[in-house]
C-alpha cells in the first residue's frame, strides 16, 4: 500500500463521511427523528477522518498483528477524540459531548465502551478497509481521481471554516474569532444570522452538551498566538538541551539533537509543550499519578506518530529504539514513555507555572516586531529544514539536482553537514 498525499486524502474524506453516516444513523435511531451529526453543513465528522489518517500512518507497519492494530487503534483514536473534545472546549467554552453517564469514562471526554469500538474499527480499516478503498480508487482515471480529491478536500476545508464561523456565538469570549466573524459577516449579516440560527439549532439537537448555558471551567484566560510561539521556541530549545545532556551522560558523546538546520531546536519537544499548555492547563488539581499516566499514553502516541510521519515525509527514521526492551516497531519504548509521564508531571506542576511567570515578567519588554521576527525566522528555518531533508533523501537515492533550489541545497546542506545535524538518522529502503 503506497501512502502519499492523495491516498491519505481519500482516507480522510471517506472515513469522515462514513463516520458522519454512522453517527447520524445512530443518533436518528435513538431520537426517532433525523439528526444530522455534522458540525457544519457538509456530511463529514472529521474526527473519524483524522483518526483514520493517524492510525494508517502510525500502524501501517503493524498490519500483520491484529492485537497491535486493535490496541494501537484504540489508543490513537481515543487520544484523537480526547484532543478534539479538549480543543473544542478550549475554543468554544462548551462541551460538545459528555460521556459522564457511562462507565469507565475519563472526565466525560472519552469512555471505555467507545474506545473498544474505535479499536475494532481501526483494526478493520488498516487490515482490510484501506486496501479495498484503494482498489476501488484504482479504477478511476488518474486525472479524474486527482480532481475528485482536490475538490473533496476544498469542500472539507470550507466546511471546517464555515463551522468555526457558524458556532462563533459559542466562542464570543474569543475576541480574535469574534473579530474575524464580524469581518466575514459584514455586508451579509442578515443572511448569516438566518443560516447561523438554523445550523445552531441543528447542532444543539445533535450535540445537547454544547447547548448548556453555563460555560465550562475552560473559560479561562486564553493563550495568544504570540504566547504559543514563544512557548514553542522555549520548549524546543530546552528539549534540545536536555536531550544533548542526556546523550552525553548515557552515551559519553556530544551529538546534535536538533530537528532544524539552524539553531538548537527540537520540534518534537516544542510542539509537545505547546499541546500540553493548550490541553493540560487547569490540570494542576489532578493527582500526580493521573498526570503521569496521561503523559505516558499521550507522549507515547505522540512520539510514535512523529516517527511515522517523518519517515513518510522524508524517508528517514530519526530515532530507533529497536535495541530497547518493550519497544513498538522501534518507534517508542516503555522506558521513554515513562519519561514522557515524568515530563508531564514536571511541566504541569513546576515547568509551566515557572515559564508563565517568566513570560509575564518579560512580556511588557517584548515588542511586536520581536515576535514577528522570531515567527519569520522559525518559519524559514522549518521550511529550509524540510527542503534540506527531502533533498538529502533524494540525493542519497542517487537523484540528480532537478532545479536551482536543489543545486543550492546541495551546496549548503551536503551529506556531511546533514549527517552532523542528524547523526542518528537512518534512511529507510523503499519496498519495491
Residue ranges, per PLM feature:
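Aromatic-rich, lipid-facing transmembrane alpha helices and their immediate juxtamembrane interface loops
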Residues: 1-432
Amino acid at each position: 500500500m503506497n501512502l502519499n498525499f492523495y491516498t491519505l486524502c481519500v482516507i480522510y474524506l471517506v472515513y469522515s463521511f462514513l463516520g458522519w453516516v454512522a453517527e447520524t444513523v445512530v443518533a436518528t435511531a435513538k431520537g426517532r427523528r433525523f439528526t444530522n451529526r455534522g458540525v457544519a453543513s457538509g456530511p463529514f465528522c472529521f474526527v473519524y477522518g483524522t483518526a483514520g489518517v493517524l492510525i494508517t500512518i502510525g500502524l501501517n507497519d503493524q498490519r500483520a498483528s491484529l492485537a497491535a492494530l486493535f490496541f494501537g487503534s484504540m489508543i490513537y483514536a481515543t487520544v484523537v477524540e480526547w484532543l478534539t473534545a479538549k480543543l473544542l472546549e478550549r475554543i468554544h467554552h462548551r462541551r460538545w459531548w459528555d460521556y459522564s453517564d457511562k462507565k469507565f469514562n475519563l472526565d466525560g471526554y472519552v469512555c471505555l465502551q467507545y474506545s473498544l469500538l474505535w479499536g475494532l474499527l481501526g483494526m478493520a480499516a488498516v487490515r482490510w478497509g484501506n486496501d479495498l478503498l484503494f482498489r476501488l480508487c484504482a479504477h478511476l482515471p488518474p486525472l479524474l481521481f486527482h480532481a475528485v480529491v482536490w475538490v473533496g478536500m476544498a469542500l472539507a476545508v470550507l466546511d471546517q471554516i464555515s463551522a468555526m464561523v457558524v458556532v462563533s456565538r459559542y466562542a464570543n469570549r474569543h475576541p480574535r474569532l469574534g473579530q474575524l466573524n464580524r469581518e466575514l459577516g459584514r455586508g451579509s449579516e442578515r443572511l448569516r444570522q438566518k443560516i447561523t440560527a438554523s445550523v445552531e439549532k441543528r447542532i444543539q439537537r445533535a450535540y445537547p452538551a454544547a447547548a448548556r448555558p453555563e460555560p465550562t471551567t475552560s473559560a479561562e484566560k486564553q493563550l495568544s498566538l504570540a504566547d504559543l510561539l514563544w512557548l514553542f521556541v522555549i520548549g524546543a530549545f530546552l528539549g534540545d538541551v536536555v536531550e544533548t545532556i542526556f546523550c552525553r551522560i548515557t552515551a559519553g558523546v556530544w551529538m546534535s539533537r536538533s530537528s532544524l538546520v539552524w539553531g538548537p531546536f527540537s520540534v518534537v519537544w516544542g510542539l509537545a509543550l505547546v499541546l500540553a499548555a493548550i490541553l493540560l492547563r487547569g490540570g494542576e488539581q489532578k493527582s500526580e499519578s493521573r498526570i503521569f499516566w496521561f503523559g505516558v499514553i499521550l507522549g507515547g502516541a505522540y512520539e510514535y506518530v512523529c516517527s511515522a510521519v517523518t519517515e513518510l515525509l522524508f524517508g528517514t527514521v530519526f530515532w530507533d529504539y529497536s535495541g530497547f526492551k518493550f519497544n513498538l516497531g522501534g518507534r517508542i519504548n516503555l522506558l521513554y514513555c515513562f519519561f514522557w509521564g515524568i515530563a508531564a508531571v514536571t511541566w504541569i506542576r513546576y515547568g509551566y507555572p515557572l515559564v508563565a511567570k517568566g513570560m509575564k515578567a518579560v512580556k511588557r519588554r517584548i515588542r511586536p516586531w520581536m515576535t514577528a521576527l522570531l515567527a519569520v525566522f522559525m518559519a524559514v528555518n522549518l521550511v529550509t529544514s524540510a527542503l534540506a531533508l527531502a533533498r538529502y533523501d533524494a540525493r542519497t537515492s542517487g537523484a540528480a539536482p532537478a532545479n536551482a533550489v536543489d543545486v543550492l541545497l546541495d551546496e549548503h546542506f551536503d551529506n556531511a553537514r546533514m549527517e552532523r545535524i542528524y547523526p542518528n538518522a537512518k534512511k529507510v529502503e523503499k519496498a519495491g
